[in-house]
Amino acid sequence: LWVNYILKKYNKILPDMPFTGRELGKKILEEEEITNVSINPIQQLDHYNPKEKKIHIATDKLDKKSITSIAVVAHEIGHAIQDKEKYKPLILRQSLIEKTMIFQRIGSFLLIIGLPSIFAFTKSPFITLIAAIIIMGCLSTNVLIHLITLPVEFDASFKRALPILKRYVPKENMYQCKSVLRAAALTYLAQSIVSIF
């Protein structure tokens, strides 16, 4: 997957980088006067949680002096800035995600329990096909939500994070930063597509 390739490619330590992702993140939060958001390590997917006011960054990135570390932290801070400014598309995205979680759970349940039961108790290929379509529809809601809200991700990367990074990162590293910001913007969409298959 291209997203993972880019994130790994630029997660190499740069000895000349004056800060880690966490250090730069704290500095940006302070400059943006965002005092109610913390930066925390996590084992899973990098994300900003607007309810908890927490930025979660994978432990293999957070304290590194790498392009991936600083760009991913800046991207997630982009979401914190959106939240601070009450950016309507971010609020809409959160609402949609919460509302579609039920469809994902139904789809998962039907995939694990429903489809095998249908195979066991019916010989009708039509019923099996309808059940498969319903299951795929339920599981695809996540992809649809992230596709619809992709502009929120690109806003966090290129309208919020990129101008900040231009103040701190040497020009010779900006191309790599843009690649990582693009990958960060596409992470949720890529993960949701992979989760279907």
Regions found by a protein language model. Name each.
Residues 2-103, 144-194:
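Polar-ligand-bearing catalytic/cofactor-coordination segments
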Residues 90-115, 130-134:
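Long, charge-patterned amphipathic alpha-helical coiled-coil/hairpin "stalk" segments used as oligomerization
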Residues 123-137:
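Hydrophobic alpha-helical transmembrane segments
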Residues 138-144:
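Alpha-helical transmembrane segments and their membrane-interface exit regions
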